[in-house]
Amino acid sequence: MKKRALITGASRGIGEAVARRLAFEGYDLCLVCKNSIEKLRLLAGELKAESGISCEAYACDVSDPQQVISMLQQAGQIDVLIHNAGISHIGLLSDMLLEEWNRVIDTNLNSCFYLSHELIPQMVHRKEGKLLFVSSVWGNVGASMEVAYSASKGGINSFTRALAKELAPSNIQVNAVAFGVIDTQMNQCF
């Protein structure tokens, strides 16, 4: 039976590259982004035409639990989650507003909870599933001028380790990939 993967942050960069690879591997896809839905629809159409897969595009702000619930209800069964959506805020912590801190933590870390909380019951029922969270080397070593981003990615690392232990008896794999600096639009300032 064909596997179905949901990829957040799929309209560009790492998310787009992962979508292209999984389409090549024959996965049916649910592509998710917050702002670039027209670009995402074009990508979905391209992947369908090239690979003959089912590929749907969803607009969803993963920092909003109600949008996550609604999107997942539309998407249906998901076998693999690749949670790539993320944002950063560059600047001194002392200059950062609480709203900016919360936006980074909600988008990068709390969204892991929102997505997992909704997907885990169906995966436990099937006794199968994969959850993959995109982290960063900054989650392990920290980065000056990116305290919120570093904290959110460190949180993802701990979240992943704990959830992997919790879900291992249900045959659900939980992992994180901690990238270094990748040449994406998000990192153009480096």
Task: Please tell me what each predicted stretch does.
Residues 94, 141-147, 169-170:
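Active-site loop immediately N-terminal to the catalytic Tyr-X3-Lys motif
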Residues 11-12:
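Conserved glycine-rich cofactor-binding loop
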Residues 92-93, 100-105:
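Substrate-binding pocket helix/loop in short-chain dehydrogenase/reductase
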Residues 136:
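Residue(s) in the substrate-gating loop at a strand-loop-helix junction
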Residues 25-42:
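Conserved glycine-rich Rossmann-like NAD(P)H-binding loop of the short-chain dehydrogenase/reductase
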Residues 116, 152, 160:
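Active-site helix of classical SDR
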Residues 121, 165-169:
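Alpha-helical segment proximal to the catalytic Tyr-Lys
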